[in-house]
Structures are given as structure tokens and as C-alpha cells.
Amino acid sequence: MPIVPKHFFERPTLELAEKLLGKIFVRRISDTIRLKGRIVETEAYCGEFDEASHAWRGKTTRNSMMFNSPGMLYVYLAYGSHYMLNIVSEPENIPGAVLIRAMEPIDGLMFMKEQRGTALATSLLSGPGKLTQAFAIRGDCNGKDLFNNEFFLENAQDIPQNAMGSGSRVGITKSRQLQWRKYILNNPHVSKARGS
């Protein structure tokens, strides 16, 4: 499959949250281990006018990656225990990022199961903390991009609007009315939050 180019990510965050659905996230662990997951659920965080966004109060050392080049990885530790994988959106210096909330495992399931300690395919990547654990994504991945041999996206057909659902974002206390969580309808790998 063709690799998704950099200009793909340089678009409004909410649009990117939809366009990422169906794309294949790839991490190359070694010459013999390649992990692949189809993105089935995302959340948009739209910068300085979104109270739930890390960038709402402006640029800081912690959130500076949200202001970086589109297609960069913004990885941070949430609740002191789970890493969150985000893909930077928008032109550089305009803050925005899309949280990858769930994936459908495609390749490298044995490695993923070892990382997660579970054999059930539908729960391997069905949450943001689960998928970072399965893909061995930690804080040292923050600032890497999707244009190298370790991380990249493979292109796939866009998900049509009638096959896409929207809902409120999970685990936030502000801007909860915004329907900025996007997911593929009827996909069993979407997180349990799909019904909200």
C-alpha cells in the first residue's frame, strides 16, 4: 500500500480525525516484527479554542509538540499510567492533534498479545492506553514523525460518512458537548465508549 504523505496531515484537526479512520498505522519493531493496526476511532483536539485541549491556554513546554509540523507524534503520559498517541494536525504553529483512540489489529498480533497480556483480539487495541501498550509506544516516541522506517501510515480507502459515527470525547470535563470523537460504525474494535 502507498505511504500517506506529509501534506495529508496539514489540514483542520476535525477533518483529519475523520480522514484517519481506515488508515493503517505501522510500527516496525525490528527486521522481523512489523505491527499494523487499522485506525477505527479518533478524537480531535483543536487547539486554543478547545477547552479540553492541552493547547487551550497557549504554548508550554509540555504541549509544544501540538504546535509542531503536521504528521508528528505527540505522546504523553495520562493519569500516571497510560501513554496516549496523538498525530499532530494543522499547519506548523497552529496547535491541533488527533488522539488515536482504537485500532483493529492486522499484523504482529503475537507481539501485541505479549505486550498486552491478553489473547482476545477485540480488546487488544480497543482503547488509547491499550494500543500504546500493544505497540510498545512510550514517552521516547514523542516527537517522532510518520515519515520514516519505524513509524508510518499506509493509505486506504476513505470511510464514507454513512459508515462513520460521532460522539462526545471520553475522559474530559470541559467541552463535552462537542461531538469530536469519530469512529467506524459497527466495528467491534471501537472502544466501549462508542455508544455515548
Curated annotation (Swiss-Prot):
Protein name: Putative 3-methyladenine DNA glycosylase
A Gene Ontology biological process term: base-excision repair
Disulfide-linked positions: none
Cited Gene3D superfamilies: Methylpurine-DNA glycosylase (MPG)
UniProtKB keywords: DNA damage, DNA repair, Hydrolase
Family listed: Belongs to the DNA glycosylase MPG family.
GO molecular function term, any single one: alkylbase DNA N-glycosylase activity
Matching SUPFAM superfamilies: FMT C-terminal domain-like
CDD domains: AAG
The enzyme's E.C. designation: 3.2.2.-
Organism: Chlorobium phaeobacteroides (strain DSM 266 / SMG 266 / 2430)
HAMAP family the UniProt entry points to: 3MGH (MF_00527)
